[in-house]
Amino acid sequence: MGSLSRSEEMRFCQLIVEKDAAFNIVAEIGKQPYVQFKDLNPNVNSFQRTFVKDIRRYDEMERKLRFLESQIVKDEIVIPGRVDTGDYTILPTSELNTLEGTLTELEKDVKSMNDSDSQLKANFMDLKEWDAVLDKTDEFFQGGVDDQAQEELENLDEEGAVPRVEKGPVNYLVGIIRRERLNGFERVLWRACHHTAYIRSSDIEEELEDPGTGEKVHKSVFIIFLKGDRMRSIVEKVCDGFKAKLFKNCPKTFKERQSARNDVRARIQDLQTVLGQTREHRFRVLQAAANNHHQWLKQVRMIKTVFHMLNLFTFDGIGRFFVGECWIPLKHVEDVRKAIEVGAERSGSSVKPVLNILETSVTPPTYNETNKFTAVFQGIVDSYGIATYRELNPAPYTIITFPFLFSCMFGDLGHGCIMLMAGLWFVLREKNLQARNIKDEIFNMFFGGRYIILLMGLFSIHAGIIYNDMFAKSFNIFGSGWKNPYNASEIEGWINRTEHGKEMLVELAPEDAYDHAGGPYSFGVDPIWNIAENKLNFLNSMKMKLSVILGISQMTFGVILSFFNHTYNKSKIDIFTVFIPQMLFMGCIFMYLCLQIILKWLFFWTKEATVFGQIYPGSHCAPSLLIGLINMFMMKDRNAGFVVDGGKVNGEYREVETCYLSQWYPGQSVIEMILVVIAVICVPVMLFGKPIHHVMQQKKKAKELHGNATVRANVVSDSSEIVLNGGSKKEGAAHEEHGHGGHEDESFGDIMVHQAIHTIEYVLGCVSHTASYLRLWALSLAHAQLSEVLWHMVFVTGGLGISGTAGFIAVYVVFFIFFVLTISILVLMEGLSAFLHTLRLHWVEFQSKFYLGLGYPFVPYSFKTALQEAEAA
């Protein structure tokens, strides 16, 4: 927990390595995520850096690999393995040169095969079209279409309905066109030829493959009868405009067409054989490439990252050594030293690399070491803001509080089970799903949050049991603490009154109907409340008070955590002027309210009793906490006790009018007055405490500096310098002593404004944030009501109201509808809503009490991370 509760200690280091060993050393460092390099050449353009040529070389190799990958995917060949797994050792230079040559030859071969395949497919397409044209032409002539065309053209010529056509025999053109263009083609041709062309068409049943795009297309064969060369020219231009292909050498006789058809089909068969062999060869080549693709890509990308890191280094004066600066977690410094030594040995360097730890005033990056379980919770915190260096990390507490607050809003046993099963499915199939390398963004979002889904489902089951709620129904495990106090004659009387039109209202008074001897219900909510008319009144009151208690508890816990930050920073002024006043303010008002809620639950029951030494007549005198809180701030006088002094009159107590507004424990007004005064005093302490302390410290340091600077006039300059330097050291010590406060370099005005903002934010935030926690009650109410409405709308009104065989079938149909609506609305939509509200409660209400989040992340150089990012891009 140590590394997660507070970020790791960091060290700023300088790395000096020999030029020839730099590559292997950086490559060895990249095997573990321990080092974040600093760019020592910020003003140098990325295209002018030392290793830009090497990066371009491997960029070209990566481009070739991406081309091969596109061809492999196009042929639906599976690429085994993952890029970011396995060994991260870089191949020797000779093997990398061989790989470069292999990729060049592969790209050349695949492109050559693509060109050859495209040409073969184009020839195959031409032959298939020619075969279809020959078949359809026979069909046209067998149907007597030539005689019909001759007759129609001659009739048009004799009637003079259109301009006269040229003399001569009737000719025809045969062609092929895409089916979707046929209608437009016929209309344009009819108008362009002034109704003097006769056209007929027929669809080709077989789908043809476009050699350019590979898509399946539908085409039609057409035949056009016309007279004269002029009309032929017009037709050819229209065909060209519609990208229709004409076959001008179509045989005139059936015998010639039959001979041509036999020749075409023989050539088609030969081409199919050649295409099959070409595909087999292409498949073998791409399959071999696919088996090695991830390893090749991994090597190329790792080498690129090494050169990118080397571009962050600078040279020494003689150009023999590389100098780099980096951040390293303190506990991994020795691991990095070992990695550097291994890299130097691998390169055969005779000069031992040097790793120096430097002093710096720069704030280190924040590094919280996580695993696959804690990473999602750390991600939730980091989404709001990266923790300031060595600041207390909210993530360990979020692991419990986040799913718990979610379950308060999503508390349903049935819905929790669904969410739990979804989380379990992701967790149990974790390795299998990772190996499939699914790139769908929504899926990866759910998969990344698999552990938080699991916990939210588990906690929702717990909350559902407490609420006694499962798909809007209660379950009776421990029986009910309520009983029927009425006899048969009383029930008969109610039934008779109901039959006479009078409204019957059966009321179970807790004085008589509840089993007081059995104590509170064993666990959760009594199931009888599910059928009660005043169910919402009871549940709303309970959940509202629970929300207030949980909210104030979490905010108080946040304030307590701020104490550990102040202690770690050795800032006593923050403890006395921030933490203590904040705790007193929170305790005097809000923790006091929580105490009142709990005491009211414990002591103010339905029966007459003595509470805190005062006579309590019954539930109608239970104190009103809301009005009591208002009276507390107004310091309004209230009656002491619930009954009038003087005891009983006629055997009964004389109750105070509006007894629920009375003081319910001795000295309540005085105690509450003291609490209000303390809370009010805390505000100016928070507002002026640190600014006043700052002024006092400035005066003290100025006085010390003035005293140290007093030097006798006759002292030699060297001695004077020593005295003055001593004063500077004292000043630096004072600066160091109070440096953790964070305000020593700020002016009084800046600190005053800062404190004013934070004081106002805290005081108003305590009120607004407490109200904000009421969303726990509001969303729980909305979820329960929506679940109940869905149950009644689907089951009661729908399937369960139908009898007979139809009802038997309807139950299955209605259950399917209920299941779909439950998953889509009550689990996904309501779950997302509760998740976002829980996110807000943690980011604002909880973390604002102690978390600054002003840091920047530690981004270590790592082969695994670089490969994962490149794969996701």
Swiss-Prot record:
Keywords recorded for this protein, A-Z? Cell membrane, Endosome, Glycoprotein, Hydrogen ion transport, Ion transport, Membrane, Transmembrane, Transmembrane helix, Transport
Q: In what tissue types does this protein appear?
A: Expressed in the H-shaped excretory cell (at protein level). Expressed in hypodermal cells around the vulva. Expressed in the main epidermal syncytium. Expressed in the sheath cells associated with head and tail sensory organs; specifically, expressed in the apical sheath cells of the amphids and CEP neuron and in the sheath cells of the OLQ sensory organ.
Tell me, what is an example of a GO biological process annotation in this record?
A: multicellular organismal-level water homeostasis
- What is its subcellular localisation? Apical cell membrane; Endosome, Multivesicular body membrane
The stretches that face the Lumenal side, renumbered to this chain, are 429-445, 565-574, 636-668, 807
Q: Which InterPro entries match?
A: V-ATPase_116kDa_su, V-type_ATPase_116kDa_su_euka
Subunit structure, as described in the record: V-ATPase is a heteromultimeric enzyme made up of two complexes: the ATP-hydrolytic V1 complex and the proton translocation V0 complex. The V1 complex consists of three catalytic AB heterodimers that form a heterohexamer, three peripheral stalks each consisting of EG heterodimers, one central rotor including subunits D and F, and the regulatory subunits C and H. The proton translocation complex V0 consists of the proton transport subunit a, a ring of proteolipid subunits c9c'', rotary subunit d, subunits e and f, and the accessory subunits vah-19/Ac45 and vah-20/PRR.
| Described purpose of this protein according to its UniProt entry | Subunit of the V0 complex of vacuolar(H+)-ATPase (V-ATPase), a multisubunit enzyme composed of a peripheral complex (V1) that hydrolyzes ATP and a membrane integral complex (V0) that translocates protons. V-ATPase is responsible for acidifying and maintaining the pH of intracellular compartments and in some cell types, is targeted to the plasma membrane, where it is responsible for acidifying the extracellular environment. Involved in the assembly of the V-ATPase complex. The V-ATPase is required for the function of the excretory canal.
Give the protein name, as stated in the record: V-type proton ATPase 116 kDa subunit a 2
To which species is this protein native?
Caenorhabditis elegans
